[in-house]
Every structure is written in structure tokens, then in C-alpha cells.
């Protein structure tokens, strides 16, 4: 299990291509429910993977892909409509969304799940 985001989407993509294994994208969500920003990322990664002979063969992947394709030019606008954005507004930190939606700010993978811990790669 690796941890990816918009911030390192190309590094994540390259790692998955190099592994040449089936991919399952699991979105963290919030309190056992999906959220917009994670689903946008899943759609963006799915979009990238489709260009490398991977398949989007279930409804969740197709819905994430559609959400991303419909909003790829206005990610922040749609993310600011999310429940998570409302939570961030209460703390005065909506700028975090803008940061997290930056594409390829970091050219490497940051973390991997090993057992029950996230470790640096």
C-alpha cells in the first residue's frame, strides 16, 4: 500500500506502472464516507493509468473518473464545495485545499503502509 496525492501523482503513477500489478485505489474519505477531494484524486490517477493499459472496470472508478474529467480545470472550485472545506473554514485553513490540489509539487513517493504504520519510502 502506497500513499499518493495530487502533490506526487506522477511519482505514484510511475511506481504503479513499474510494479505492473493490478491497482486498487482506496480513498481515505471522512468517517466512513466518500469525499470530493479524495474522489477527484482517484479520478485523476485513474485517468493517468488508463493511458498505460490499466482498466477502470468498476462503477467507483468510473464515477471518480467522470467527476475528475468534469472538474479537472476547476479542482479548487469543486473542492471548496465539499464538507471537508466547510470543516477547514471553521479552523480558518481552507488554504490547505489549494496546497493539496497542486500537481507534482513533490517528485517522489512519500509514504507506504507497513503493518499498521506509515513509513517513509
Please tell me what each predicted stretch does.
Residues 1-49:
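Conserved mixed alpha/beta catalytic, RNA-binding, or beta-rich assembly cores of soluble enzyme
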Residues 36-43, 47-121:
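Long, charged alpha-helical interface segments
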